[in-house]
């Protein structure tokens, strides 16, 4: 369980980084050339989601390590679903962050009613969110099904339940 605790702590830290990135002015400056993005958009598009994906992958890998389940057709199917979730999660991050930047900078957060701004606003506030949640749900469902098919060999003790619960509460906030 030590590896799981470390990975869950990594996810909690990643959420903290995402919150600091979004809710503070530390990352409000522009990237060059042409002020093509803000640092906050860049961080939320590449390093933060990448860290999330890596942590999810390592959780999946830890769940099935040494298991004969990895040789089954169900595992192959679930792994393809995981890759699909990763792709959708990544595509949505790219779509959302760029259109969020454009919407904020050129469309007055959706208040400008031109055709271009309507398209940007829709990609920012709706389409990218649908794709994000589909990817996020797929990755989580795969982890749940993997855990179901390869139950932990060692029983969780009270300390494990406390640690997992604290991480869940932090992530849930």
Residue ranges and their predicted role:
Residues 99-125:
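Membrane-interface interhelical connector segments
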Residues 117-141:
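Hydrophobic alpha-helical transmembrane segments
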Residues 87-92, 158-173:
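Hydrophobic alpha-helical transmembrane segments of integral membrane proteins
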Residues 37-51, 92, 127-136:
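Alpha-helical transmembrane segments of polytopic membrane proteins
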Residues 88-108, 144:
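Transmembrane alpha-helix/helix-exit interface in multi-pass inner-membrane proteins
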Residues 1-13:
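N-terminal membrane topogenic signal
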Residues 52-60, 132-154:
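Transmembrane alpha-helical segments in integral membrane proteins
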């Amino acid at each position: 369980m030590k590896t799981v605790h470390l990975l869950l702590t990594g996810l909690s830290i990643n959420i903290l980084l995402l919150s600091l990135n979004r809710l503070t002015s530390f990352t409000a400056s522009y990237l060059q050339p042409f002020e093509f993005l803000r640092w906050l958009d860049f961080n939320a598009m590449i390093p933060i989601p990448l860290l999330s994906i890596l942590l999810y992958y390592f959780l999946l890998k830890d769940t099935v390590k040494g298991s004969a389940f990895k040789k089954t057709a169900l595992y192959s199917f679930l792994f393809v679903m995981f890759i699909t979730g990763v792709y959708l999660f990544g595509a949505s991050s790219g779509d959302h962050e760029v259109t969020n930047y454009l919407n904020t900078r050129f469309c007055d957060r959706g208040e400008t009613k031109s055709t271009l701004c309507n398209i940007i606003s829709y990609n920012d506030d709706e389409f990218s969110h649908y794709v994000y949640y589909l990817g996020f749900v797929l990755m989580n469902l795969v982890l749940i099904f993997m855990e179901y098919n390869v139950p932990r060999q060692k029983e969780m003790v009270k300390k494990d339940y406390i640690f997992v619960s604290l991480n869940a509460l932090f992530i849930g906030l």
